[in-house]
Amino acid sequence: MSTESMIRDVELAEEALPRKTAGPQGSRRCWFLSLFSFLLVAGATTLFCLLHFGVIGPQREEFPKDPSLISPLAQAVRSSSRTPSDKPVAHVVANPQAEGQLQWLNRRANALLANGVELTDNQLVVPSEGLYLIYSQVLFKGQGCPSNHVLLTHTISRIAVSYQTKVNLLSAIKSPCQRETPEGAEAKPWYEPIYLGGVFQLEKGDRLSAEINLPDYLDFAESGQVYFGIIAL
């Protein structure tokens, strides 16, 4: 073998050496890329499944453990939702046959007195101390507007056992007529609802009343339009 042939063989071997050594490195790099892609897809699939089935999700609101950080009304509502339905409750409706007055009845459909509440002298008597939701609605109806201004009032009052004085808890005034119906013009009907509601601390034996000033304008055409009630919280 000549010297030139030996030199040519060495050069060919040197050129072939990088290609041979690059082969395993390229294979290893491809293997790592495949593994990374597989783990990425598997992780995304697992996360989707956990979100879909509710295993993980947005953090739920938690009530503070310290009772002093919760408002009294919130504590009462939470306590009410956890206890049996033995709390005082009342829902009375207006008597459509009582002319010229607003008379409450409990012996009617969708009316009730439960767990100690009494209806005496057209007033609801509170059976126990605590927070109560008090509410009432009336619906007035008229035809046309007279010359004198029509003012409709609706008031919920309390007579407490501690001081025996009538005090207004909730009150509202509305005027359905802005101007008098012109002479000869058609007297169009009008409707005016008034709703009152609020939460109050009451004592055992307190009496509550819901009154209006113009009972002749009350609308009894449909049931469920005029009512009065309390719910212990």
Curated annotation (Swiss-Prot):
Q: Which InterPro entries match?
A: TNF, TNF_alpha, TNF_CS, TNF_dom, Tumour_necrosis_fac-like_dom
Modified positions (Phosphoserine) are S2
- Glycosylated residues are S80
Instruction: Alphabetically list the UniProt keywords.
Output: Cell membrane, Cytokine, Disulfide bond, Glycoprotein, Lipoprotein, Membrane, Myristate, Phosphoprotein, Secreted, Signal-anchor, Transmembrane, Transmembrane helix
- Entry keyword Transmembrane: yes
Q: Does the keyword Glycoprotein apply?
A: yes
- Which ranges carry the THD domain? 88-233
User: Could you tell me which cysteines form disulfide bridges?
Assistant: C145-C177
Q: Which GO terms describe its molecular function?
A: cytokine activity; death receptor agonist activity; identical protein binding; protease binding; transcription cis-regulatory region binding; tumor necrosis factor receptor binding
Topological domains on the Extracellular side lie at: 57-233
Where is this chain primarily localised?
Answer: membrane
| Any GO BP annotation | endothelial cell apoptotic process
Record PTM: The soluble form derives from the membrane form by proteolytic processing. The membrane-bound form is further proteolytically processed by SPPL2A or SPPL2B through regulated intramembrane proteolysis producing TNF intracellular domains (ICD1 and ICD2) released in the cytosol and TNF C-domain 1 and C-domain 2 secreted into the extracellular space.
Q: Which GO terms describe its cellular component?
A: external side of plasma membrane; extracellular space; membrane raft; phagocytic cup; recycling endosome
Residue spans crossing the bilayer: 36-56
User: Lipid (N6-myristoyl lysine) linked to which residue positions?
Assistant: K20
Database matches in PROSITE patterns: THD_1, THD_2
Give the similarity note.
Answer: Belongs to the tumor necrosis factor family.
Its biological purpose: Cytokine that binds to TNFRSF1A/TNFR1 and TNFRSF1B/TNFBR. It is mainly secreted by macrophages and can induce cell death of certain tumor cell lines. It is potent pyrogen causing fever by direct action or by stimulation of interleukin-1 secretion and is implicated in the induction of cachexia, Under certain conditions it can stimulate cell proliferation and induce cell differentiation. Induces insulin resistance in adipocytes via inhibition of insulin-induced IRS1 tyrosine phosphorylation and insulin-induced glucose uptake.
What quaternary structure, including any partners, is listed in this protein's UniProt entry? Homotrimer. Interacts with SPPL2B.
- Indicate what this protein is called per its UniProt record: Tumor necrosis factor
Q: What is the species of this protein?
A: Macaca mulatta
